[in-house]
Amino acid sequence: VIRTVAKYCKGLELENDAMNNLYARMPGEDPEKPVVMLDAHTDECGFMVQSIRENGSLEILMLGGVILTNLPAHTVMIRTRSGKLVRGIISSKPIHFMNEAERASQSLSIETLIVDVGAVSRKEVTEVFGISIGDPAVPEVSFSYDEERDLCFGKAFDNRAGCACII
């Protein structure tokens, strides 16, 4: 994004920081004049592998604001340290494994959700799949366009549209 924006900022002083925020300033700006900030972001909510269970399932932490009830049955992509992407699916405890109190409450917490990558042991997760504690995971999403209705379907359009408007 920074390289793309830089193409449109000829004559401006560009600077980016450790968080990849981009600052574009007019050369010789007057400190007496008002400052205008255009703000948008391209980051997304995601997860991090917190632990690997003996049975090969992954416990995750949330990074950002995520609505828990939207998570079960969604696929995620886990990026290993080698850069390989591993697909997994978020699962909640199956109803036939729940006790009466769990069935009655129907509540979810991040601690009750796991990611299943198809492994049957911790060893398989680490040695075959290459997944480690601390590896990031993001929701696997798609984009589609309905030409007949002129509609786009996807997620995080507010973020993406904001960046496009600034550019």
Q: What do the predicted segments below correspond to?
A:
Residues 1-167:
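N-terminal hydrophobic/helix-forming segments and targeting peptides
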